[in-house]
Amino acid sequence: MGMMLLLLSMLAGLVAEAEGQAFHFGKCPNPPVQENFDLNKYLGRWYEIEKIPVSFEKGNCIQANYSLKENGRVKVLNQELRPDGTVNQIEGEATHSNITEPAKLGVKFFQLMPSAPYWVLATDYDNYALVYSCTNIIWLFHVDHIWILGRNRYLPQETVTYLKDILTSNNIDIEKMTLTDQANCPDFL
């Protein structure tokens, strides 16, 4: 009985932590990723257009810059403008997690933490990218993260609709997606 209460308490805590995030029962879906993914063409600056809210992003003007390091890994620099006007940034590293599917990357921001999936589901390299990440939690449920990215601060609505259609056709829930405010933003990088 005590173990069941502990498990239920842990689940309640995880649900509270995942508030606003896409929390679902069952295992992560396995959508197809971008075919013939070219990492070198993907490098550079991307602006966040829409996302499923995540606890670690609190600001607006969110952007990411990907660059190749000497060791062949990818430097990831994420930046946002906080409500108080200060810039928050975090640097991490991305590596290929599946050699046969180069669009499946793993991203790590802290040494002792495991890599998080970073799957590029679709990109044309010049305008848009659709990124999906999903983590299974104790084999009972999963938490989705989705980012629609653009090389510019705004994407045409038909492009956003096209990318959301990819998600829904793979049974990925988009209900909690929100716009990222990119108005009057500085270029951080």
UniProtKB/Swiss-Prot annotation:
Homodimer. It is found in: Secreted. PANTHER family: APOLIPOPROTEIN D (PTHR10612:SF34). APOD occurs in the macromolecular complex with lecithin-transport and binding of bilin. Appears to be able to transport a variety of ligands in a number of different contexts. GO terms for cellular component: cytosolic ribosome; dendrite; extracellular space; neuronal cell body; perinuclear region of cytoplasm. This is Apolipoprotein D. Keywords: Disulfide bond, Glycoprotein, Lipid-binding, Pyrrolidone carboxylic acid, Secreted, Signal, Transport. Belongs to the calycin superfamily. Lipocalin family. Glycans are attached at N65, N98. The lineage of its organism: Eukaryota, Metazoa, Chordata, Craniata, Vertebrata. Its main location: secreted. GO terms for molecular function: cholesterol binding. The modification Pyrrolidone carboxylic acid is found at Q21. Residues 1-20 form the signal peptide. GO terms for biological process: brain development; glucose metabolic process; lipid metabolic process; lipid transport; negative regulation of cytokine production involved in inflammatory response; negative regulation of focal adhesion assembly; negative regulation of lipoprotein lipid oxidation; negative regulation of monocyte chemotactic protein-1 production. Disulfide bonds join C28-C134, C61-C185.
